[in-house]
């Protein structure tokens, strides 16, 4: 919703692209979507503008990703005391997995595996969770969605899963790279030792930016050079950012954060929020 409020067109594209990445990240071929379009009063020009912009973005993404809408519904006039809800296009995607034994999960599988970041990272913080929750700011443009890059990168990741070279896969979205890595570490109960952010990108943008069309993939050492060479040959951005191992997530030059501590924060947030402790 925050993306759509700032830029309905890009927000509509992103909603479809994220569903496409979710299906891709398990190794399935994305087939179709259902949409649930929730907006305020369309008799107000600004609300109708949001609705039309989001639909244009959804349509563009569906065409490029070959991910058609096969069902859906629309809910309008959602407002309280004259104030409309945030524009919320909800997208559900379905895909086909030919062989469930060749599917992927986000959990780190073993120590000593290479962690790869696939897709271009610029450190885009506009409308990010980091900007909102850490900095207390809701501003800027959302990250642009390059649909051609989404298609290319996703097809490559799906091929890696089917070939058995990807041992764990997680698509990046809310919270950015470091949040995804923490989720992978918690799921597998295996830590990660990470390289520092590249000098060309500010650290908070690198770790928490929400650039689109990206995945974290782990591969065995025996497959690493082959994977890097193949992706370089087809001009898919890919860089090794660290290795799995240990009982903490550690960035070079920083203090480690134990998986146990991450899990406690993750699992306690909702109960604490409902109890009014946050």
Predicted regions and their residues:
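Glycine-rich phosphate/pyrophosphate-binding loop regions near the starts of catalytic domains
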Residues: 1-123, 128-139
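Generic structural signal for well-ordered, non-membrane alpha-helical segments
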Residues: 5-12, 16, 47-55, 84, ...
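A general structural motif
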Residues: 12-14, 95-98, 144-154, 194-201
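Charged, low-complexity, helix-prone segments enriched in Lys/Glu/Asp/Gln
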Residues: 19-23, 34, 147-155, 161, ...
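Glycine-/charge-enriched secondary-structure boundary and capping motifs
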Residues: 54-61, 65, 70, 74-90, ...
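A glycine- and small/hydrophobic-rich beta-loop-beta segment
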Residues: 131-169
């Amino acid at each position: 919703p925050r993306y759509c409020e700032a830029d309905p067109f890009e927000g509509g594209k992103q909603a479809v692209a994220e569903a496409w990445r979710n299906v891709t990240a398990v190794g399935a071929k994305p087939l179709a979507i259902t949409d649930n379009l929730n907006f305020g009063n369309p008799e107000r020009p600004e609300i109708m503008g949001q609705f039309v912009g989001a639909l244009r973005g959804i349509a563009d993404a569906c065409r490029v990703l070959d991910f058609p809408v096969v069902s859906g519904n629309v809910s309008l006039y959602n407002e309280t005391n004259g104030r409309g809800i945030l524009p919320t296009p909800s997208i559900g995607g379905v895909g086909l997995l030919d062989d469930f034994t060749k599917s992927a999960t986000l959990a780190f599988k073993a120590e000593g595996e290479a962690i790869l970041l696939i897709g271009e990272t610029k450190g885009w913080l506009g409308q990010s969770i980091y900007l909102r929750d850490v900095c207390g700011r809701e501003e800027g443009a959302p990250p642009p969605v390059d649909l051609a890059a989404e298609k290319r990168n996703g097809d490559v990741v799906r091929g890696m899963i089917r070939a058995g070279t990807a041992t764990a896969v997680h698509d990046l979205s809310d919270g950015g790279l470091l949040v995804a890595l923490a989720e992978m570490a918690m799921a597998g109960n295996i830590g990660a030792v990470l390289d520092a952010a590249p000098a060309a990108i500010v650290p908070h943008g690198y770790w928490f930016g929400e650039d689109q069309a990206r995945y974290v993939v782990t591969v065995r050492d025996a497959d690493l050079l082959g994977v890097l060479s193949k992706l370089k040959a087809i001009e898919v951005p890919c860089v090794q950012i660290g290795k799995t191992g240990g009982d903490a997530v550690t960035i070079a030059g920083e203090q480690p954060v134990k998986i146990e501590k991450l899990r406690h924060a993750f699992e306690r947030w909702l109960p604490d929020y409902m109890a009014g402790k946050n």
